[in-house]
Amino acid sequence: MQRRKFLSTAALSLPVLAFANQQASSSENKRNRTGKGFVVKSGQSRFGEQTKLGGKSPNDIKVSTKDTNGDLTIFEYTGNEKGGPPLHIHPNQDEIFFIMSGSFLFKVGEEQFTLTTGDTIFLPRNVPHTWAQLSEQGKMYFQFQPSGKMEDFFRVLGALKAAPSPEQGAKIFADHDMQVVGPPLSF
């Protein structure tokens, strides 16, 4: 009888322990978050870090994973050439893009959308997607939720002296928890 009582008591205490662990984790997240608001000026990056994709197009961190304890990262991309990434999947992240200027073609699953100034698009996790800048100049905000390894991904791309081969690109994507599943958009 003692064993049965012990097992019943232990089983009943599991939800309480899980709740306490969740509360402790939540408190830790709050401690690690930025405690103050902040401003990042136009043309600047959160910690003064400059990343240029292809050596030409600034991709500035506006809200860092450090600010949100990994919950969210926001970038401002200023595209100075046409083109975009290969078709890929983020298994763990949703993305949102807001077009500030220019024209962009997005592919999400089997659908394609042309976005211009003021448009927003949501890209759910686990859905193949890509985009291409159609205009000579373009600017957009985009965010990842949760952050994942995206800040490091763009640092690696920004440090490249030349465009990676498709194989090198696929490895860079894989190293940052993404999967390349097709080529960039043709336009």
Positions of the model-derived regions?
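Short, conserved beta-strand element in jelly-roll/cupin
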Residues: 78, 91-106
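N-terminal export signals
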Residues: 2-26
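A short glycine-rich, His/Asp/Glu-containing loop-to-beta-strand
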Residues: 50-87
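Histidine-centered catalytic micro-motifs
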Residues: 86-92, 130
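C-terminal segment of N-terminal export signals and the immediately downstream linker at the start
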Residues: 20-55, 159
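Short acidic-glycine-tyrosine-enriched beta hairpin
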Residues: 111-125
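Ligand-binding loop in jelly-roll beta-barrel domains
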Residues: 125-151
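Acidic/histidine-enriched, glycine/proline-rich intrinsically disordered or flexible terminal extensions
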Residues: 156, 160-187
